[in-house]
């Protein structure tokens, strides 16, 4: 199965690419981690936030893998411990269905994307830079996989 990270934003600093790549390479083929960067809508002219989010929403829909389990990352989502994430991962992998995590841009996500999600998670109660959210999600997915496989990476 595959874990897709669909992230609005395509010009991340080098530390984001390096951090994400580190954990992506650690994931085994049976739980492949794939990143799709979505170009944010340009904030020019008279476009309001709703119009910007709508344009980004359409871009997200075009790259969303068909039939996947959709998890939106949002600061108002459910907070889960690492152990709970490991349980969720075990359930997702048991279903055989790919999972798509969606990270919004500077203005968040359009309500339509939030409504189509099967689950809504928060990485933190704090607002995080979007690049850091990618790295943190990749690390936590690797950690959850390690827990489920009794790998020594996670030491509780």
UniProtKB/Swiss-Prot annotation:
SUPFAM superfamilies: alpha/beta knot. Coiled coil: none annotated. The keyword Transferase applies. It catalyses: pseudouridine(1915) in 23S rRNA + S-adenosyl-L-methionine = N(3)-methylpseudouridine(1915) in 23S rRNA + S-adenosyl-L-homocysteine + H(+). GO terms for molecular function: rRNA (pseudouridine-N3-)-methyltransferase activity. S-adenosyl-L-methionine binds at residues 73, 104, 123-128. One of its GO terms (cellular component) is cytoplasm. Disulfide bonds: none annotated. It is an enzyme of class 2 (transferase). Belongs to the RNA methyltransferase RlmH family. PANTHER family: METHYLTRANSFERASE, RIBOSOMAL RNA LARGE SUBUNIT METHYLTRANSFERASE H. Specifically methylates the pseudouridine at position 1915 (m3Psi1915) in 23S rRNA. Homodimer. This is Ribosomal RNA large subunit methyltransferase H. It comes from Nitrosomonas europaea (strain ATCC 19718 / CIP 103999 / KCTC 2705 / NBRC 14298). The gene is rlmH.
């Amino acid at each position: 199965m595959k874990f897709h990270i669909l992230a609005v934003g395509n010009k991340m600093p080098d530390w984001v690419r390096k951090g994400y790549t580190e954990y992506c390479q650690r994931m085994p083929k049976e739980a492949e981690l794939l990143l799709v960067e979505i170009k944010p809508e340009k904030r020019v002219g008279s476009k309001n936030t709703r119009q910007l989010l709508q344009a980004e929403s359409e871009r997200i829909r075009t790259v969303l893998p068909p039939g996947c389990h959709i998890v939106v990352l949002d600061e108002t989502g459910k907070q889960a411990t690492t152990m709970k994430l490991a349980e969720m991962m075990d359930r997702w992998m048991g279903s055989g269905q790919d999972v798509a995590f969606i990270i919004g841009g500077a203005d968040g996500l359009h309500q339509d994307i939030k409504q189509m999600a099967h689950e809504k998670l928060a990485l933190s109660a704090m607002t995080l830079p979007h690049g850091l959210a990618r790295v943190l999600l990749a690390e936590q997915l690797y950690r959850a996989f390690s827990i489920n496989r009794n790998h020594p990476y996670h030491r509780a």
